[in-house]
UniProtKB/Swiss-Prot annotation:
GO cellular component terms, A-Z: endosome
One Pfam family named in its UniProt record: COMMD1_N
Naturally occurring in which organism (per UniProt): Dictyostelium discoideum (Social amoeba)
Chain's gene name: commd1
Listed name of the protein: COMM domain-containing protein 1
Family: Belongs to the COMM domain-containing protein 1 family.
Domain COMM: 112-186
GO BP, sorted A to Z: copper ion homeostasis; negative regulation of protein localization to cell surface; negative regulation of sodium ion transmembrane transport; positive regulation of protein ubiquitination; regulation of proteasomal ubiquitin-dependent protein catabolic process
GO MF, any single term: copper ion binding
PANTHER family: COMM DOMAIN-CONTAINING PROTEIN 1
UniProt superkingdom: Eukaryota
Function: Scaffold protein in the commander complex that is essential for endosomal recycling of transmembrane cargos; the commander complex is composed of the CCC subcomplex and the retriever subcomplex.
Subunit (UniProt): Component of the commander complex consisting of the CCC subcomplex and the retriever subcomplex.
Length: 187
């Protein structure tokens, strides 16, 4: 299993089985038949052990959207051979974005914000007051429906609303608070 061709095939099988959910890649016996049938020294137990070790590292890296340099350091600290480390690093460089997108799509179940636009306008009158001359922000949110159970997958919703100065300040404070929390979690 120290040949790049075979180890890369194992990683490709892992990608198809675990992330792409390929029906042809259901069991490790299939991997043994497809790739390692000519190698008598490679047992199903060895394939399973190596597969699980690779999957553990890739899963950890994918869920934390690990940078390539961090991934390389983790692989270097593991007990993989040099050839296997090179294959894993190459695999992650090539498939990082693809795996992240697959995980992202499978974990989203609500609408997503596709576009936000805004402008400042002057409110001149209302029902109660004939002349106001007060600045307001007009916000427009375009949402994309990502619910896979719905037949209208491409349906987009448009939400428009006005905010006065106080509402805008509150919203900005909340956004800043969210940003601080996200930054604290990413460190």
């Amino acid at each position: 299993m120290d040949q790049p061709k075979y180890f890369s095939s194992l990683l490709g099988f892992l990608l198809k089985k675990e992330y792409e959910k390929d029906e042809d890649c259901k069991s490790l016996e299939t991997l043994k038949e497809m790739v390692f049938s000519e190698q008598d020294d490679v047992t199903l137990e060895l394939i399973e052990f190596t597969y699980n070790k690779c999957f553990e590292i890739i899963q950890k890296a994918s869920y934390s959207d690990m940078q390539i340099s961090t991934f390389e350091n983790i692989v270097k600290e593991s007990d993989f051979t040099t050839v296997q480390q090179e294959c894993l690093n190459k695999f992650w460089k090539v498939n990082k974005k693809k795996i992240h997108e697959i995980i992202y799509k499978t974990t989203r179940f609500n609408n997503s914000l596709q576009k936000i636009s805004w402008r400042i306008d002057v409110k001149t009158k209302s029902k109660e007051i004939s002349e106001i001359n007060e600045p307001v922000s007009i916000v427009e949110l375009k949402l994309k429906n990502t619910n896979t159970n719905n037949n209208n997958n491409n349906k987009n919703d448009l939400i428009r609303f006005e905010m006065d100065k106080n509402q805008l300040e509150e919203t900005l404070q909340q956004i800043n608070s969210i940003q601080k929390h996200l930054q604290a979690k990413s460190l």
